[in-house]
């Protein structure tokens, strides 16, 4: 038989015991204990780390390839005294022809700048890059105008390229239009300007520029279109050759379209206004 005193003592003991453990009650509640056991904090952190490592592992190869592609530049300093044996543009045209099931010849004769008509030198600079001798590789006003035009068009259509930029593309780059290729073009252009004189850049450009199907360089262009050497070109003939440079495989100076004739006339007026460039 349990006495009232014993029952009271039992209640008092239980009360004291509950008072002692009550601060721990929230952390020891079944719900809290169950949650802590099924979703430990360390597991969530481990999963986050694994995701981060996976993303880094996937991105690193891409970043490495872009770094190599952008920053491992061709050694343009060799062009001070050595002429290129072939250009990226020539190889691209050959590959395009082979993809269509035929081959094209390559009409190309290298000549020093001193053997190219001063009229042609003037005409090309006037038509392609009027500030060539004063800028450091880039015509920022032209680039700004091209950027606004491309923004309105919604795609890359116009480049605003200088002669040095065109040389970089002809020598080393593919014909695709992308921001990554423009970045590489920028770096190569800077390198060309740093290592070569303006006269050497112009000489290289005039000797590798495309002037028709399989026709490269001023000497080959003069023979192909006018049956003469580039040193003997008149101002009128030089203006025609400069006029077809933007689309040399489409235009022919002997087939004078209205648009080509207008471009020729503008170039010829610029030649007549400017003094003849001195012999290099």
For each predicted feature, which ranges?
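Juxtamembrane regions of bacterial inner-membrane/periplasmic proteins
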Residues: 39-280
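N-terminal Lys/Arg-rich, disordered targeting/topogenic segments
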Residues: 17-50
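Residue-identity detector for glycine
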Residues: 8-15
């Amino acid at each position: 038989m349990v006495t009232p005193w014993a029952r009271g003592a039992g209640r008092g003991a239980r009360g004291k015991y509950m008072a002692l453990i009550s601060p721990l009650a929230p952390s020891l509640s079944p719900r809290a204990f169950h949650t802590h056991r099924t979703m430990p904090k360390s597991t969530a952190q481990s999963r986050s780390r694994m995701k981060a490592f996976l993303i880094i592992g996937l991105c690193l190869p891409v970043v490495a390839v872009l770094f190599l592609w952008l920053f491992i530049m061709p050694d343009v300093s060799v062009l001070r005294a050595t002429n290129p044996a072939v250009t990226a543009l020539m190889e691209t045209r050959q590959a395009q022809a082979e993809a269509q099931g035929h081959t094209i010849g390559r009409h190309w004769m290298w000549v020093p700048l001193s053997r190219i008509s001063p009229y042609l030198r003037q005409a090309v600079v006037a038509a392609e890059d009027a500030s060539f001798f004063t800028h450091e590789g880039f015509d920022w006003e032209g680039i700004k105008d091209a950027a606004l035009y491309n923004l309105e068009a919604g795609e890359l259509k116009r480049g605003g390229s200088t002669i040095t930029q065109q040389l970089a593309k002809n020598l080393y780059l593919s014909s695709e239009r992308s921001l990554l290729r423009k970045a590489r073009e920028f770096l190569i252009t800077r390198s060309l300007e740093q290592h070569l004189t303006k006269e050497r850049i112009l000489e290289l450009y005039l000797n590798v520029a495309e002037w028709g199907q399989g026709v490269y360089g001023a000497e080959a262009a003069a023979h192909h279109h006018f049956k003469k050497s580039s040193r003997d070109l008149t101002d009128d003939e030089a203006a025609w050759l400069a006029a077809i440079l933007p689309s040399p495989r489409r235009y022919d100076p002997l087939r004078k379209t209205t648009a080509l004739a207008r471009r020729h006339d503008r170039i010829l007026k610029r030649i007549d206004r400017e003094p003849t460039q001195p012999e290099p």
